[in-house]
Amino acid sequence: MESRGLVTAVSLTLSICSLLLLVTAIFTDHWYETDTRKHKEMCDSQGNSDPTEQKNRLMPLYQLPFRGDPSNTRRLGLLSPAPAGGVREPEDLLENWRSLLGLGVLESDCGRPLFSTYSGLWRKCYIMGIDKDIDSLIIKGIAQKCTAIKYHFSHPIRLRNIPFNLTRAIQQDEWHLLHLRRITAGFLGMAAAVLLCGCIVAAISFFWEESLTQHVAGLLFLMTGIFCTISLCTYAASVAYELNRQPKFIYGLPSDVEHGYSWSLFCAWCSLGLIVAAGCLCTAYPFISRTKILHLKFARDSCV
């Protein structure tokens, strides 16, 4: 009985630590990061930091979350400076993609407004203190530091002067990314809920039907591990899918931009490891203890 209580205490401790790590991962925004410092240094060293290129960096395209009323968007020129209150829409860039390429705005990676970012499940933010250009835009109120990640699909946009196949591909990519994001968030939420139930059941096992409740808690912990695995794999798939979206001159990243997973995702993986360990401990111990009891009974009967 003492060993069973010790196993329950260890598994409960592991599950609580796992729950804390999982909640930390869910509510922090450092799942994925991009670092454009080397990219900017490379562009500067190649002499691409001329006034035109600098102007392009100070006139962010649709990727930047702008403040203000979207009704003012259409009255602004696509390549005009973005004033406080101006909002750029994705279709503005896409409708004029040929002219943009002709003007050379997107032909060169150094002409693109790329800034260091970090993102989580709920929002994407720019890293302050690295690039003075984005710092200036945020301080002036032209751009927001963080923007919410979409979990709903807006009405299909009508794109002019753009091939139908490209328009359809962009919309299909939006659908696929939306589903992947929903799967990631949904399964992670279910994992947190099931893990909380498992912790409660494990705590109850100290006072009532220790063998049964311990086994049920172990099954709940293993179910949490399955949900976490699905969620984390889906998140990795969504990141890879987004990096390979078409057209590359809008959605892709230059080779010299460093990008990768960050500490929030590490917390989620650590949570997965702890909860699987707790689940295996809770589910395996009753069978091991039962085998030992049967072996002792058999040895005693043999002696008699």
Curated annotation (Swiss-Prot):
Pfam family, one: Claudin_2
Protein's cellular compartments: Endoplasmic reticulum membrane
Cited InterPro entries: PMP22/EMP/MP20/Claudin, T178A/B
Extracellular side stretches: 26-186, 237-267
Signal peptide: 1-25
Record topological domains on the Cytoplasmic side: 208-215, 289-304
CC per GO annotation: endoplasmic reticulum membrane
Single GO biological process annotation from the record: negative regulation of osteoclast differentiation
Keywords: Endoplasmic reticulum, Glycoprotein, Membrane, Signal, Transmembrane, Transmembrane helix
Residues linked to a glycan: N165
Bilayer disposition of the protein: Multi-pass membrane protein
Transmembrane regions listed in the UniProt entry: 187-207, 216-236, 268-288
Function: May act as a negative regulator of osteoclast differentiation.
Family: Belongs to the TMEM178 family.
The protein, known as: Transmembrane protein 178A
